[in-house]
């Protein structure tokens, strides 16, 4: 009996020591779990595009990381515009400062002039890490200016959306941005110019209810969450269980709201192809006049 007790204590002691030593040696983030299929992989398996090797889900990206994936030639617009906390909402200023520090952005969207395959485009990229990419006053102002500049200089617009909706800390000022940006989109369309939107995970709330669904060509990333209200809110309202693919990019494509679903690793080439087609059509239209 004494021998068994000694062995048990000895084993337990050594196991604790070994585990503690190994745990301190393993860097954080070495294993990652996909939020869609819940598969776990060594972080390098996700590759340069941060895509799950099992189901193809694209992990959420900061605006600057996505910009680096798209192009090396870009000039930022309106980097000096900063929200001033119009309602003096408790804790909002501190939240803004944290978001600015994490994302290196002044607001939840990056806008600027970019070159894709030597073609100039007005580019907008929303950042889900900046207060969930929420639509605030300055976000709306930057997006409106993006479309206005594109209209003035006859440029196509490519917009990557990622948002939790309107920013509650700005109240009605936030909601007004939906119509403001949509009006700028309509003026851009009336000028006969191309607008491509890429819906990424997540695109919800006031953004999907306005300018995100106004594009000439609507692309989505695989497995992206796209919808207005949350699943639980809808289920509680309609008293029904929603299907598993509800508010997914695949379901929206099936029902005609999305033109195509493009894996992230092929997205840049697809955008270049669409810009080439648009350029050819524009040349043909001018040539036929």
UniProtKB/Swiss-Prot annotation:
Residue stretches making up the CoA carboxyltransferase N-terminal domain: 30-289
A GO BP entry: fatty acid biosynthetic process
Signal peptide residues on this chain, from the entry's feature table: none
Catalytic activity of the protein: N(6)-carboxybiotinyl-L-lysyl-[protein] + acetyl-CoA = N(6)-biotinyl-L-lysyl-[protein] + malonyl-CoA
Matches recorded under SUPFAM superfamilies: ClpP/crotonase
Main location: cytoplasm
Renumbered zinc finger spans (C4-type): 34-55
Chain positions recorded as Zn(2+) binding sites: 34, 37, 52, 55
Chain's role: Component of the acetyl coenzyme A carboxylase (ACC) complex. Biotin carboxylase (BC) catalyzes the carboxylation of biotin on its carrier protein (BCCP) and then the CO(2) group is transferred by the transcarboxylase to acetyl-CoA to form malonyl-CoA.
Subunit description: Acetyl-CoA carboxylase is a heterohexamer composed of biotin carboxyl carrier protein (AccB), biotin carboxylase (AccC) and two subunits each of ACCase subunit alpha (AccA) and ACCase subunit beta (AccD).
Official protein name in the record: Acetyl-coenzyme A carboxylase carboxyl transferase subunit beta
Provenance organism: Oenococcus oeni (strain ATCC BAA-331 / PSU-1)
Organism lineage string: Bacteria, Bacillati, Bacillota, Bacilli, Lactobacillales
